[in-house]
């Protein structure tokens, strides 16, 4: 049965990020990675490839919001931009986020700062304190997966039907941070 899935956030220890303020773009954002995520489902290589394919099929880009919508709050006013240029490298899916001009006019609720400045400043100086969380339609099945030690383990493998959004959150499930650990992307 198809159901909506929101991954838990991923964080990174990366301190140097690819933030291009001139073009309102944050490059090389880790979207998802191979393995068991914080929601206890497993992203295999096929899932990552399908995620990249579905992301690149959306010619306008994949919607990104400031946090996930929930039953207590509307998502209206939380749009921040679009992800494009999806790709897989070393069993991790990456994309580039271009912030919409509206983020320069929209304030982070109760924080006294514009979304644009908050997101760009955090990406430059505290990329390990937030990440993104994919919102998909999919289902899962149980399958035997070989772990790093060569042992077989049963996992709930996620199957992707559609990619709805990838939201900026303070606690991502599908990654460890905004950027992949161990890569020096530099600041532009």
Q: Could you describe each region identified by the protein language model?
A:
Residues 45, 56-59, 80, 92, ...:
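Acidic, Ser/Thr- and Gly-enriched intrinsically disordered low-complexity segments
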Residues 53, 68, 73-77, 87-90, ...:
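Basic, nucleic-acid-interacting segments
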Residues 1-63:
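Polar/acidic, low-complexity leader/linker segments enriched in S/T/G and N/D
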Residues 63, 85-188:
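Residue microenvironments linked to proteolytic maturation
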Residues 11-19, 78-88, 140-144:
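Short amphipathic beta-strand and strand-loop transition segments with alternating hydrophobic
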Residues 58-74, 86, 132:
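Short conserved beta-strand and strand-loop elements enriched in small hydrophobics
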Residues 30, 42, 73-84:
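Short amphipathic beta-strand/extended segments with alternating polar/hydrophobic composition
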Residues 32-36, 68-70, 137-142:
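Short, flexible beta-strand-to-coil junctions
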């Amino acid at each position: 049965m198809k159901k909506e899935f929101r991954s838990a956030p991923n964080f990174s220890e990366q301190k140097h990020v690819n933030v291009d303020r001139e073009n309102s773009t944050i490059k090389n954002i880790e979207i998802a990675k191979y393995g068991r995520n914080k929601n206890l489902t497993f992203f295999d290589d096929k899932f990552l490839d399908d995620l990249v394919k579905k992301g690149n099929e959306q010619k306008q880009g994949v919607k990104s919001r400031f946090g996930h919508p929930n039953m207590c709050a509307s998502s209206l006013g939380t749009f921040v931009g679009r992800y494009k240029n999806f790709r897989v490298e070393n069993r991790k899916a990456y994309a580039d986020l271009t912030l919409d001009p509206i983020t320069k006019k929209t304030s982070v609720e109760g924080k006294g700062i514009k979304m644009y400045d908050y997101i760009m400043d955090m990406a430059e100086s505290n990329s390990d304190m937030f990440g993104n969380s994919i919102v998909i339609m999919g289902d899962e099945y149980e399958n035997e997966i070989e772990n790093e030690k060569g042992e077989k383990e049963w996992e709930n493998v996620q199957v992707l039907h559609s990619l709805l959004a990838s939201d900026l959150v303070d606690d991502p499930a599908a990654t460890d941070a905004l950027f992949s650990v161990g890569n020096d992307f530099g600041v532009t």
